[in-house]
Amino acid sequence: SGSCTLRTCWKKMPHFREVGDRLLERFNGASKVMGGNDGKTLIPVGQNIKPPDKQDLIYSDESPDFCLANRKTGSLGTRGRMCNSTAMDISGCDLLCCERGYREESVVFEENCLCRF
């Protein structure tokens, strides 16, 4: 009597944080392009920029200024938003307040902690 070994292989998705980090890296390195005359070629806008490959993110139009309210784009702007003065990401005051400055305010929250002694 013979025996068979069954082996199953599959691809596993990376952790969500890793996917986000990779996308952010590509977003930060995105290249502005315009279409070539042949309708197939993408030409980088600017000097000393390498042509994009299949892994690069590209764009053809500049993003609107989300710092200011704009009915056309649906942006409410960032004026009056709460920010984190110690954060270095998009929730940080330096980025969110668009270099307009900000006012610091201390807020104290009281809540039941459901502690047991």
Curated annotation (Swiss-Prot):
Cystine crosslinks: C83-C98
GO molecular function: cytokine activity; frizzled binding
Keyword flag Cytoplasm: no
One Gene Ontology term from the biological process aspect of the record: animal organ development
Keyword annotations from UniProtKB, A to Z: Developmental protein, Disulfide bond, Extracellular matrix, Glycoprotein, Lipoprotein, Secreted, Wnt signaling pathway
Location(s) in or outside the cell: Secreted, Extracellular space, Extracellular matrix
Positions glycosylated per UniProt: N84
SMART domains the UniProt entry points to: WNT1
Pfam families found in the cross-reference section: wnt
Keyword Secreted listed: yes
Superkingdom of origin: Eukaryota
Gene Ontology cellular component terms for the protein in this record: extracellular space
Lipid addition sites, O-palmitoleoyl serine: S1
Post-translational modification: Palmitoleoylation is required for efficient binding to frizzled receptors. Depalmitoleoylation leads to Wnt signaling pathway inhibition.
Family: Belongs to the Wnt family.
Annotated function: Ligand for members of the frizzled family of seven transmembrane receptors. Probable developmental protein. May be a signaling molecule which affects the development of discrete regions of tissues. Is likely to signal over only few cell diameters.
Protein name: Protein Wnt-6
Organism: Thunnus thynnus (Atlantic bluefin tuna)
